[in-house]
Amino acid sequence: MTLPRPFVFALACLLLLAACASQPPLPSSPPPLARALVYQVERQTAEGSDALLLAIQPEGAALRFSLFDPLGVPQARQQLIDGAWHADGLLPPNPRARTFFSVLLFALTPTDQLPGAYAAGDWQRAADGSRTLKDWQVRYPATDRLELQAPDGSSYHLALLPESAP
């Protein structure tokens, strides 16, 4: 049985749209970073927990995100250039890391810049200072710490390393 070509095209478009809709939105402009930030990251998933190191480097109008395992082996490298993610280096695509980076951009955006950076229906701010982006929860337990809770139950606990603190 052969499906009609318009049906196949429509189905492909719907699948592509569904894949795009599941990604957290990117800001209209990235948060301003005066210098590189380095975080110790603890990722907890149903499979277990991982220790990671994350470096975020401003490079002109772009931001470079580099995620490493404890041995220094790169796990993900992406650049945010002109509002879109671009591969940085020869690593294979890492959709989980790209989603994490997108939510982290939201977490790092100053509160007063959120209305201009994100569509009103995409985010909320609670009285306790926590935020929600789509189905992700962002909490700020201390000035140098972030907690991100994913819709699937996994979580990321980030601690800013002292050398990179503003």
Tell me the role of every PLM-derived stretch.
Residues 21-24, 40-42, 49, 73, ...:
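Mature, soluble, non-transmembrane domains
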